[in-house]
A protein has these predicted regions:
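N-terminal secretory targeting modules
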Residues: 2, 9, 19-197, 207-209, ...
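Conserved SGNH/GDSL esterase-like catalytic core that processes O-acyl groups on lipids
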Residues: 28, 47-53, 76, 80-85, ...
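Hydrophobic membrane-targeting alpha-helices
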Residues: 13-17
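Catalytic His-Asp segment of secreted/periplasmic serine-dependent ester chemistry enzymes
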Residues: 275, 312-393
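Surface-exposed amphipathic alpha-helices with a cationic face
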Residues: 292-300
């Protein structure tokens, strides 16, 4: 009897130990926001429609959960069902991989305004760097949904309930995400997870639709799908004020520190603050470095390593003047030399034209402010190399 009890105890301890070696870690995430204009919402109501959205994960896993958000809406959103599947071309899916997700055992849930919910944990063979399809069947929805405007990926909307084995008869297509906020996997406790704070250059303005080639995507691929890289960039966003959606100074806790499993943070934001300068720029320099210090302090308090990304060149764009350039140089010098950061990812140095360091390389620019796909590829590879060097220190 004593031997049986001892064996049972050892089994229980082994299971507890196994659980302690794992943690929920975000493999994909996005920064939720309110619609900025009418074009940020579908022409067709989401109510009583099925929405198929595609995401590109970084690390894989055998158990996952999805976070859905209604944080930016003023009315409840009714979710009748959600299923995931390996994504194919366009709206196609591999029907053999379809897995319905539940909420406390139920397929349906109503998310109150200002709230977010998790699905129950589900078994799923999620491969590193794969594309995953998320299909939501809605009941009643708010007229203005919680969104992420810059998905850089096509989403598909069809009338009524989508059946996994039936063709998805899309009535509308658009490049926005709605209600999906994060996908997490159960990963070893040693897993690194990099949360990237940024604006449209992180959000991927200038990338190729449906190619998942933001610099963060390239970074994840260069790291071989072994390190989680999550993109919390918002197009037009500022650190202090004046941009689109809540500034980084207000959203840092929610969008960065609340992500599960984060071990490292890259702060790569400030160009929109600089672009909006209408004086000598001294105050903007002070405010940017003030919040960089605050962000770094918050990360350090949670045991998170934090790196600063220098602001990339913008000569030949509407942001450029001698004053704006001087502020960029001042802020970048602070980023390169600050003791608040555990390291600097010198995107400025990586992307500037050797013949004119105030401008992007011509072959890497989309509009002289944003890189093109080749520029983002160079940035992602550069960031991955820098990250690996930081791990040696």
């Amino acid at each position: 009897m004593r031997k049986i009890l001892m064996t049972s105890l050892l089994v229980c301890l082994a299971l507890v130990s196994l659980g302690a070696q794992n943690k929920w870690t975000a493999t994909w995430a996005t920064a939720v926001e309110r619609p900025f204009s009418a074009s940020d919402m579908p022409k067709t109501s989401l109510s009583n429609h099925s929405l198929r959205q595609i995401i590109h994960v970084s690390i894989g896993g055998k158990k996952l959960r999805l976070q859905l958000s209604n944080e930016m809406s003023e009315q409840p959103v009714e979710i009748k069902s959600v299923y995931i599947a390996d994504a194919g071309k366009g709206e196609a899916i591999d029907a053999s991989t379809v897995t319905y997700l539940t909420f406390n055992g139920s397929r349906s849930v109503t998310i109150e305004p200002g709230k977010a919910v998790y699905t129950d944990a589900a078994a799923y063979k999620l491969k590193p760097l794969q594309r995953l399809s998320v299909t939501i069947y809605y009941g009643q929805t708010p007229p203005k949904a919680t969104t992420h405007r810059g998905s850089r990926t096509t989403s598909f909307l069809m009338e009524g309930e989508s059946k996994p084995k039936a063709a998805f008869a899309a009535v509308e297509k658009f490049e926005h995400w709605y209600n999906i906020a994060a996908l997490e996997v159960e990963a070893p406790a040693s897993t690194r997870c990099i949360a990237c704070l940024g604006n449209s250059i992180t959000d991927g303005r200038g990338t190729t639709t449906d190619m998942q080639n933001r610099w963060t995507d390239v970074m994840a691929e260069t790291l071989g799908g072994k390190v989680a890289v999550i993109n919390l960039g918002i197009g037009g966003n500022s650190v202090v004020s004046g941009g689109i959606s809540a500034p980084a100074s207000e959203r840092f806790n929610r969008d960065i520190l609340s992500q599960q499993g984060v071990t490292d943070v890259i702060i790569f934001q400030g160009v929109n603050d600089i672009g909006g300068i209408k004086d000598d720029g001294a105050r903007t320099s002070r405010m940017l470095t003030k919040f960089y210090r605050l962000f770094a302090k918050k990360c350090r308090e949670k045991g998170i390593r934090v790196y600063g990304g220098t602001i990339t060149p913008f000569k030949n764009s509407s942001y450029y003047s001698a004053v704006h350039e001087q502020v960029r140089q001042t802020v970048n010098q602070w980023i390169r030399t600050s003791e608040y950061y555990d390291g600097c990812i010198d995107f400025d140095k990586a992307t500037s034209d050797p013949k004119d360091k105030e401008a992007l390389r011509e072959e890497w620019q989309a509009d002289w402010l944003h890189p093109n796909a080749a520029g983002y590829k160079a940035m992602g590879e550069f960031a991955a190399k820098a990250f690996l060097e930081f791990q040696k220190e």
